[in-house]
Structures are given as C-alpha cells and as structure tokens.
Amino acid sequence: VCALPDSWPGHCPGQFAFVRFDRAEGAHPFTIASAPGALGENARGEALLRLVIKPLGDYTRTLARRLQAGQGVDIEGPYGRFDGRGSRARQQVWVAGGVGVTPFIALLEARQPGLATADARLQPVQMHYCTRDAARDALLGRLQTLCAQAEPAVTLTVHDDARGQRLTPRTLEALGGP
C-alpha cells in the first residue's frame, strides 16, 4: 500500500503505474489493485493505493525483504485503460488467473456498496478465476468477498487446477458463457 502525493491525477480501476522503490533500479510497471477511494487515507490525509506484486523475476523476488514500512517510492502514472462498464446489450464475462486478477480486484472494489457509482453501463458479470491451487491462493478469499458484495452482481466461478477444474472453451460455454 502506497500513500499518494497531492499531485496524483487520480486513477481508474485497473490502470497501472510505473513504480520505483530504489533509485539504483529503474521503474517497473505494476497494476493498481485498488479502486479510487477504496483504501481511504493515512493519518496525514494522503490517499492510499494498493499494488499486488508477485515475486516472479530477479527484481520482484527481492522486494519483500528489501521494502520497509514508510519507505519512499516514486509513482508515475496512471496509464492504460481497463474499463469494466461494457455495453447494456452484451453480457460481460471476465476471465482471470493468478496475479492477472489484480485489475479485476480494482474493478470489483469500484462495485462495492458505498463506492459503486450509479453508472447505467455497469452490468452483472460472470467471472471465471483460474488458480493452480485454491487452498493456497493468497488472493482468492478477497476475490470471493468482493464478488459476493458487488453491485451489480458478479457471479464467481473458481477453476482449481489442483482439483482438475480447468477452464476450457467447452466449460465456458456449458456455464453460459459467450
């Protein structure tokens, strides 16, 4: 979780930012995994923003042991467009897997009671989340809670590879997908 400066232009759910935690290392792109206003403010009144960073490469693997609470970071952005509003004429089906769920978490936070806007283009959604092992998935509990409380509704189907539940075009079609 990062505190944002007053100069932050604001972001939309699912955008990304370039973040630099160390001046010796260049900035890296990370998805913003929180909706505007979803995390509130810190004691100094600064808006908060969440990044979800999976330790996949040489750089991200070292972050957990190198970063410290209160450490300054440089955040540039936001960038990109990941719009979950869609069209009233078409049902939305969201498919995500692993850390690729982070932009969807931000979209789901924007659909929570108190944060949800009265945007007429927001439609109910079918969401499919693919995970290697649901029992060990660090994001699944949060995802389930957000989907259960979303306005309008988001129906979540979890595809747990550890239990042989893989998402295929045939599975998607059988579940009422496009």
Q: Model-flagged regions — what are they?
A:
Residues 93-102:
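Short, glycine-rich nucleotide/cofactor-binding loops
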